[in-house]
Amino acid sequence: EEYTEWYGGTFLDKKLHEQAVYGLPEFFRDKIKGKKLIANPGCYTTCSPLAIAPAIANGLVSTKGIICDCKSGVTGAGRKPTQGNHFPELNEGFHAYKVACHRHTPEIEQTLSKLSGEDVTITFVPHLLPVNRGILATVYADINEGVTFEQIRNCLLYTSDAADDKA
């Protein structure tokens, strides 16, 4: 099972898991209305799709070769002390971690696949910054032929409208 592969565990209550609905309201509002159990996406699994979904949903960019280049503050790395989030290692520097094996990869791909109706695979590169809080997703995609910069700009400026129109 994919969950076991990426998270290294199993569901405590499989029945509850089967009842859960994925809860990114910007895109799946109708699916979560009235539900009792909503699976809440985390940091990267929220910011990455929000950055590119309007362009994908409106057919402006290719769903192939998407790169999610993300940065987060050290608090996003969890509470467990590790070499990578130890102050002397992180202070005045930053680094990529879990490149090509981060557990949020399939969740981002799942969201973008649902929005596009195609199988989307991404290259996801998270970075840890020496700041207490914050997150940034810069997402790269090839612009489809005939699409203008103005179309991309307008789509991303009016994210909620664009997402609501297609998602």
Language model features with spans:
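Active-site-proximal loop/hinge segments within enzyme catalytic domains
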Residues: 83-86, 118-142
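Single conserved hydrophobic/aromatic residue that forms the stacking wall/gate
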Residues: 158-167
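Glycine-rich beta-alpha junction loops
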Residues: 42-45, 69-76, 101, 126-132, ...
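Oxyanion-binding "anion nests"
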Residues: 105-124
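N-terminal Rossmann-like NAD(P) cofactor-binding subdomain of oxidoreductases
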Residues: 1-92, 97, 117
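Short, conserved charged micro-motifs
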Residues: 145-153
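Short gly/pro-enriched beta-turn/loop segments at secondary-structure junctions
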Residues: 61, 92, 103, 117, ...
